[in-house]
Amino acid sequence: MSPARNTGIPASAADAARRHAELVKEIEEHAYRYYVLDAPTISDAEYDALMRELEEIENAYPELRTPDSPTQKVQGAPAAHFAPVEHLERMLSLDNVFTEGELRAWIARVEKEVGTDAAYLCEPKVDGLAVDLVYEDGVLVRGATRGDGRVGEDVTANIKAIRNVPHRLHRDGNLPALLEVRGEVYFPVADFAELNAGLVAAGKAPFANPRNAAAGSLRQKDPRVTASRPLRLVVHGIGAHQGLAAARQSEAYVALAAWGLPVSERAKVATTTKEILDYIAYYAEHRHDLEHEIDGVVVKVDQFALQRRLGATAKAPRWAVAYKYPPEEVTTKLLDIQVNVGRTGRVTPFAVMEPVRVAGSTVTNATLHNADEIKRKGVLIGDTVVVRKAGDVIPEVVGPVVALRDGSEREFVFPSHCPACGTPLVRENGGVDIRCPNARSCPAQLRERLFHIASRGALDIESLGYEAANALLESKLLADEGDLFLLTPEKLRTVPFFTKKDGELSANAVKLLENLESAKTRPLWRVLVALSIRHVGPTAARALAREFGSIDAIRNASVDELAAVEGVGRVIAESIRDWFAVDWHQEIVAKWSAAGVRMAEEQRSAAKPLAGITVVVTGTLSRWSRDSAIEAIQDAGGRAAGSVSKKTDFVVVGENPGSKYDKARQLGIPILDEEGFATLLTKGPDAARSMAQRP
């Protein structure tokens, strides 16, 4: 279970001493499991909470703060099976801040010491294993883990097995005679699931997260095992050196990159608090676009001279701090496993858990994806489990904490019949997906399809919420979604939910009818999305609507004709053919058409200004969401691309643009701000070019 954290500072010195001793013992035990065994039993956030409580007690009772307290030293010690090696310079940890107020207080302390001329280098805090590399005359001679900050583990052979670690630096300019660099070894998120699947197939325990996978892969006794795994290094600091001329950390990064060392392409120098906060906010939103996990942003004073003036404590530099995002991984108790029936009939298991706060919200349910995933992860009812919530993504169970099992846990048995309608379930997709085949009549599937139709990505029917949908289903007014647009005031008056005491329609009934009338005029691509054709999302729907122009043309097209549309392909084409082959699906289209739902694109006589033009959007726009910007480009006849190439005509740049902006500058592609984008949409490319920024 998660460790319990006291919320108040003990009132007496005796109580404080007792709690202090408990915390020291608990923290040191968890530090050993995390840093040495690579098998933590609590999340990073829970560990941070214990450390913060210890710091609060020591601040209130300074006599309890000793040199060997966890707050005063770097955690971790060399494992017995690796030779110990002493770092040339101490390899410190970082102090953490968790709020804007704490960050501002740190900046104020920095400026009090060194003045307001400090610049700050910001970069994502990679969640991996800290390492130290030593180069002599450009040749890699040693690689080590951080250990306790003074002595680490000699893992040179394994470091050399990492694909992007140079064994010899490029001689671009004057190489330092001695160069000690610090970095983070990480495991790419995209490769993590594949690694765990292979471990389970081999009868081995899976890793709980990519950070543990990185640590476990680097600490292999056989370097060939390390070499077989897709580890990567990113360098983020400098230790001892002889002959490095840079005056700033950002300048040093340029030199390191020229010598062949991998440094973060996302590091950015900020000169104001607002710029720092904007950077932190950007990666809070876009952290899951990165190839590696991050748990915050590191902010460093950029000038080396100011770093030296600020100095360090025994544990951390005073010139750097880690801004930690709300935790995305925590541990809690798995109380039960139940199943949910989706709009396409797919039956998905989900975890019912003790409430736990993760990524800024309290969750009690988390997805388990499918029956095979439960077996692969080895999750049992009653387990203490690691739960992850990535931004707005549905929380998921990552895996069990096997070390905390007590024998009372039990296996989950997948149901054989649909819990909503009682129909026998069937396996599809090679046995991975389990579905209820009663698509038309299963109340759970129809309810989910109604929610999908009402969603913003489909027909955007605001008043068709949970209660309204349930009321319509319970009243039997809807045999299927085809009846939705046949609702009338007379029909709604028969449902208590939609009437007032005097029998007149309630406000929500009037609004529902108004919303349905508005939904009839939505563009064709939204109608296609609303029909719940498997695999047809907004991108494919837009492409189909542009190419064919009407439901009838799509229905009559061959699989080959459908598949030839860019963004569609054969899988979606066959899914469309299969959907229209079902009689009651055809009835839905007929009912909606008869009710006045638009089944064809509007005929526009004016030429589209962006015909043949490819546009890429990067960064955050104030006047458009990403989806609405893409829709605007496509409505104007253009192509909205996801990456920059020589074929790109314009790149639209908002706040905090990514690497697409840099590539556009390298290729000499016209770059537009929001005003330029508006001009492009309304007046076309010729007018926009005069407003474009060029390298």
Curated annotation (Swiss-Prot):
Which reaction does this enzyme catalyse, per its entry? NAD(+) + (deoxyribonucleotide)n-3'-hydroxyl + 5'-phospho-(deoxyribonucleotide)m = (deoxyribonucleotide)n+m + AMP + beta-nicotinamide D-nucleotide
Arranged from A to Z, the UniProt key words for this protein are: DNA damage, DNA repair, DNA replication, Ligase, Magnesium, Manganese, Metal-binding, NAD, Zinc
* Annotated InterPro entries: BRCT_dom, BRCT_dom_sf, DisA/LigA_HHH, DNA_ligase, DNA_ligase_AS, DNA_ligase_CS, DNAligase_adenylation, DNAligase_N
EC annotation?
6.5.1.2
Question: Which residue ranges does the record assign to the BRCT domain?
Answer: 605-694
| Residues reported in the UniProt entry to bind NAD(+) | 44-48, 93-94, 123, 146, 184, 300, 324
Single biological process term from Gene Ontology: DNA repair
- Quick check: keyword Aminoacyl-tRNA synthetase in the entry? no
EC class:
ligase
- Gene Ontology terms for molecular function: DNA binding; DNA ligase (NAD+) activity; metal ion binding
Q: Is NAD among the key words of this record?
A: yes
Instruction: Give the positions the UniProt entry annotates as the active site.
Output: 125
GO CC term, one of those recorded = cytosol
Q: Which Gene3D superfamilies match?
A: 5' to 3' exonuclease, C-terminal subdomain, 6.20.10.30, BRCT domain, DNA ligase/mRNA capping enzyme, Helix hairpin bin, Nucleic acid-binding proteins
- Residues involved in Zn(2+) binding: 418, 421, 436, 442
Q: Which SMART domains match?
A: BRCT, HhH1, LIGANc
Protein origin, superkingdom? Bacteria
Which co-factor is required?
Answer: Mg(2+); Mn(2+)
Protein family = Belongs to the NAD-dependent DNA ligase family. LigA subfamily.
Tell me, in a sentence or two, what this protein's role is. DNA ligase that catalyzes the formation of phosphodiester linkages between 5'-phosphoryl and 3'-hydroxyl groups in double-stranded DNA using NAD as a coenzyme and as the energy source for the reaction. It is essential for DNA replication and repair of damaged DNA.
What is the protein's given name? DNA ligase
Biological source species: Acidothermus cellulolyticus (strain ATCC 43068 / DSM 8971 / 11B)
The gene that this protein is the product of is ligA
